[in-house]
Amino acid sequence: MIIKALNSLQEEFGDDIDDFFFSYQVFIGPEEVDGACEVYDFNLISIKRLARDFSDFGIMLNRGWMISKYFDEEQIKREIEYIIKKSINKDNEISYNNIAMFLRREEQ
């Protein structure tokens, strides 16, 4: 399994370099099969943006979120590759379901 594409769907930057929110879509599939993949989405939010926008009375428990101090797209790719590595199974469907524990899998 590999990342076949990583697309930014939404980008928001504040006044500071450490104030941001991104929405991503990632295509993950077997390296040896062209075109075969599953689509997942996730959000990336800075600690500063989360602290500012998050309700003082709320609790957040959700998959499909990455929280980062600074924006680094290469680090994001490495994190997704790590998720894929942890999720690999001989059965691709099981691998896809394992990845879905971390990222939101789009419905077919």
Language-model region placement:
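Short helix/strand-capping turn motifs
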Residues: 1-92
